[in-house]
């Protein structure tokens, strides 16, 4: 599956670079700074929604700066109170899968098996909780192509789909983290500027 590996290598490096630029101080603190409540997953292909939600939740859970767990706080009022109690920022996060294409191509020269090409483009959106104000977005895309055995077509398509979605989601979340960190720093600078102007 060298085609798959090659197609995703650049995406992996981009995601790692974005993560490195985001917020090492948050990760070092060991305490979540943001609460993410996964809400809508939008896709023309409704069959892919459960998988997309699972992969988005997995990606968010892998990052120490985020949490999706507020204990027994079930109502929105209780969630907001718990967010403030823990000193976090809360966001309602949604994801839109803009395009998801699967193409079957002829075998590569000298090969017997056909090739499967998958291309996915998506975006995540974060609205403040409370407030419902759009604060950040993150775009992600991934393309891969690999050989597959006809008798294992369905299984390979599922595996390829998960790989492409996972890579695109990682890229989108990494971009969102960078934007979220930048927005927070700008708010702090703005706050300091207002305080300094208030002095006589």
Task: Kindly give the residue locations of the regions a language model identified.
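Short secondary-structure boundary motifs at beta->alpha junctions and helix caps
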Residues: 112-117, 127-179
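Short acidic low-complexity segments
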Residues: 69-87
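Gram-negative outer-membrane beta-barrel proteins
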Residues: 42, 103, 146-148
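Bacterial N-terminal signal peptides that target proteins for export
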Residues: 1-11
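Bacterial N-terminal signal peptides
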Residues: 9-20
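A structural "domain/chain start" motif
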Residues: 21-74, 141, 150, 177-200
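Surface-exposed short loop/turn segments
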Residues: 81-135
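Solvent-exposed loop/turn segments at secondary-structure junctions
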Residues: 75-78, 99-103, 142-144
């Amino acid at each position: 599956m060298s085609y798959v590996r090659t197609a995703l290598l650049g995406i992996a490096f981009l995601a790692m670079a974005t993560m490195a630029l985001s917020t090492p101080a948050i990760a070092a603190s060991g305490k979540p700074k943001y609460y993410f409540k996964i809400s809508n997953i939008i896709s023309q292909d409704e069959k892919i929604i459960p998988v997309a939600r699972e992969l988005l939740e997995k990606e968010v859970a892998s990052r120490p700066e985020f949490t999706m767990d507020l204990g027994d706080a079930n109502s929105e009022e209780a969630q907001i109170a718990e967010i403030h109690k823990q000193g976090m920022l809360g966001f309602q996060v949604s994801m839109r899968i803009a395009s998801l294409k699967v193409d079957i191509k002829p075998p590569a020269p000298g090969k017997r098996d056909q090739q499967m090409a998958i291309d996915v483009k998506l975006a995540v959106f974060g609205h403040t909780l409370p407030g419902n104000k759009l604060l950040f977005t993150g775009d992600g895309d991934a393309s891969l192509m690999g050989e597959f055995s006809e008798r294992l077509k369905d299984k390979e398509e599922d595996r390829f789909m998960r790989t492409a979605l996972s890579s695109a989601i990682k890229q989108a979340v990494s971009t969102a983290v960078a934007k979220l960190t930048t927005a927070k720093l700008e708010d702090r600078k703005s706050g300091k500027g207002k305080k300094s102007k208030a002095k006589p």
